[in-house]
């Protein structure tokens, strides 16, 4: 046992040495390849320049040389001096005027920044990308600043530990290179011949490195390789994680391989029949249900499956026939569709004879599958025709009335019209084959349109409603039921007013509470079938439940909006009192949802979300650096602009702020207790507004559709051409340190 332990320990040490040596060799080989690529590109560009130069030389040889005008005197020119240019060759002396330029004031220093019109959330930078240059004076005054800055990033500096860098490409090459040892190594005497094998393997790899990299591996690499890599690079994960990563990377390199969790294009030739969740995976992952954008950069969190449920039917079946061969003419079709809808929306099916609630067929949780047979429908029709011939005049009239009703319903119901119009005497084909694209599209639509097979057939456009119905019956035991959210009954008007008043009093109480000054970021709560009590994230953060929360619409913690009929610019408005903008989905009487494309809106408490900013001008300031000026006059409390930038965490703001303090220039603005807006790298023009103890503007953090946003408003009436100032809320020492000049008092 002791010898076995020593042998395994010695083998692990040997594998670590192999990992280090192969890693250094691959890094050196990569540098050589990079140098060869740069050299090749340089030679190619050089050759192109030489060819172009030769063409220009040939053109110049064919042109006529124009004589140069030689000035004799410049004394008549004002503000110039006469200069002579002489040459040692036999060229005549030239007279050149020397013009004197007047002194021009230099422009203020401006660091590069990227303009944007809305906030942009970024991740924390855990690695210092570059050591900022502060000048020799700053380093002489504070020699430990750089050391403290590096400590804030846990000593991680980009490019400092180059030997510890490993990307996906080097990782795959390293595993492939180490796999060669397993092929040559023998379990019994492998340790005794390591040096000889190392020389042979290295020689073979140097000769045929490129060929071996392109060849597929015969067998999966040994676990010893991943254990050795994990021991050398512990921050890259465990051996099992590295093994899974290697499988994923090698599978992506195979020809025709698709990315993970990728479904083939539904319109392509390789379309597959997949379930609804797989077809909508990209939509659910990339779509933001708060700003209704794909790949949102403001809300990086992913929605939970509870947000995928629909609260109502997109197009309920109204019972009208779409044509002479509508699926509703089949026996048991209407009952099956009603039971299906009742199961999905959790409401019992309505019987045609009354309003009593009934159970699902067969007392089961899933709707019963009726016996669908086109031949039976055909026999039934023929029996009806035979009965009509012998039934007398009354039966003839009833048949004509049914026919007229069917024709009128098919003409009136244009929404459910089936795209394939069948002739009266042609039976629909049986055993129709469904392609993968059609089956996948059907499973997607069934979760939206439920029992409206006519609408589904119209969207598929290659199948009739009867074929869609028959396919749904066949898959009734395969498709998982789409459970919708419970249908909420709207409360009575008196209760609604009571909740509005209770919410209004609750907002006032929060304003009076000292702890309400701590504003936290809003995250939608998601606790299905649980009330918003003390365990609700919104209640804990002292935030109201918004329309994005998964709680019930009659939740006591929900903000109900306002019912104002004025401009919503006084504390009489609940939204204005709660420092919120009016929500167009909640505030329906103040005009927040009207005239969305127009600036003339009655509600004055929705300027940030509408982007109703003023025209700003950028110019040098008399106070410090650059300043921002207003082009048009602005009234008191009128919205000017939103302060936009990068949304960073408080920890990231502390790290960046230490650098900004040395530059004596900061664009950090506290958004809430969790995040800060930094307009240093990205922002809009309002970032150039300077600080003043007597400002003409003020900043206000408002809740806008679930997001905290910073609005800049006029503190008084501002005339055209005035520079904009607002209070940075510096301490007295910081104000003297960063802003040495205070603007003169202006009489409004």
Curated annotation (Swiss-Prot):
It is an enzyme of class 2 (transferase). Residues 348-359 have a biased composition (Basic residues). GO terms for biological process: heterochromatin formation; methylation; negative regulation of gene expression, epigenetic; rhythmic process. PANTHER family: HISTONE-LYSINE N-METHYLTRANSFERASE E(Z), HISTONE-LYSINE N-METHYLTRANSFERASE EZH2. Residues 183-199 have a biased composition (Acidic residues). This is Histone-lysine N-methyltransferase EZH2. It catalyses: L-lysyl(27)-[histone H3] + 3 S-adenosyl-L-methionine = N(6),N(6),N(6)-trimethyl-L-lysyl(27)-[histone H3] + 3 S-adenosyl-L-homocysteine + 3 H(+). Its EC number is 2.1.1.356. Residues 200-215, 376-387 have a biased composition (Basic and acidic residues). It comes from Xenopus laevis (African clawed frog). GO terms for molecular function: chromatin binding; histone H3K27 methyltransferase activity; histone H3K27 trimethyltransferase activity; promoter-specific chromatin binding. Residues 505-607 form the CXC domain. CDD domains: SET_EZH2 (cd19218). Component of the prc2/eed-ezh2 complex. Polycomb group (PcG) protein. Catalytic subunit of the prc2/eed-ezh2 complex, which methylates 'Lys-9' and 'Lys-27' of histone H3, leading to transcriptional repression of the affected target gene. May regulate the circadian clock via histone methylation at the promoter of the circadian genes. GO terms for cellular component: ESC/E(Z) complex; nucleus. Residues 614-729 form the SET domain. It is found in: Nucleus.
